[in-house]
Amino acid sequence: MKRTALLFIAFTLSLSVFATSISVRILTTKVITSFIVSPVNGSYRIYGDGVLLAETDASGIYQLTLDNDSIQLKSFEKTLGRFGAVKLISQQVDGAFKIKSVVSESKVRTYEDDIYVSLTADHKQLQVINKVDIEKYIGGVVESESGSRTSGEYYKLQAILCRTYLLAHINRHVLEGFQVCDDVHCQAYLSRTVDPEVQKSVDATKGLVVVDDDLNLITAAFHSNCGGETVASQDVWAVSTSYLKSVKDTFCLHQPHAHWKRSIPLEDWKAYLQLKHKYPVDDSLKFVDATSFAQGNGRAIYFTDRDLKIPLKTIRADFQLKSTYFSIEQQGESVIFDGRGYGHGVGLCQEGAMRMADLKYSYKEILNFYYRGVHLVDLSALNYFRQE
């Protein structure tokens, strides 16, 4: 059974796991009709519709602009032409470029390796793709998700989880001409790695992923802060797993996102319950329940445990609350949401894991604290089974 599962993994991942690079659409949160790009390290060859146009280094600055059904490419000196596709290909393994949308509030971002530019299917904007080494991409994701504020053991764990998530979703956008995007829909990827400790941790865990007892890649869920107790997967996504179970977590209790408060006008709260959920707010007992809800010894799934059950995740989404881990108390003409944690609460609690790393827990110990009964697998070990 185990060997059969390995064969299945090797087959399904053979086109992706052993590839060295990945295509990531960047700048996806903005409508890109024009941007400026310039190398910051190494030299780049510039191609328009497959024809070599120029070779440039850090002194070169280029603007690409949507022009009807084509891409206009300009340097400071001249217009190089209009094309259906433009590529900037690094000539060194450590090539990097900076890019900025021609919008005043946009920030400069820096990425490594190559850049491919084409039109979106509707020809209304530019599609900008970073063709990048997978391990460099993972480093960028780890830093985008975690920042530069913790220890190497945490970065190692986050790298493994990011790699696992990537390989489980590696062709999410393949029909759109790329593999993953740079937003949280896939994984946040806002720049290349800047902190050398991050890339060092990525390199130290190269090829490692997490699998369950059936040797399937796990759902590598994580969130900012669980508020003291993580949530089982079935209570958020209605999908039960053997490894995403509720875990009591004291490590995150004194971290930045452990507590929050929100005040909502009482009349707004009553109207919401009545109009959306047909909650009988005029019933005196039900009104007490609606204004004195508490989560005591464990996290609740529903707003009430009586006849009418309203999912807490629905209330969280409707009021844009930080978590579902909250209690409610009436204070005058308001209801106060006294909350704990930040995020959906499933899987790794990032702030708890960071605290564990600071306390000298190893990345393997942290992994097994939040994900029960999982295993680390080196993808290179699958070569044997792939060749059988």
Describe these PLM feature segments:
Residues 1-4:
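Positively charged n-region of N-terminal signal peptides that target proteins for export
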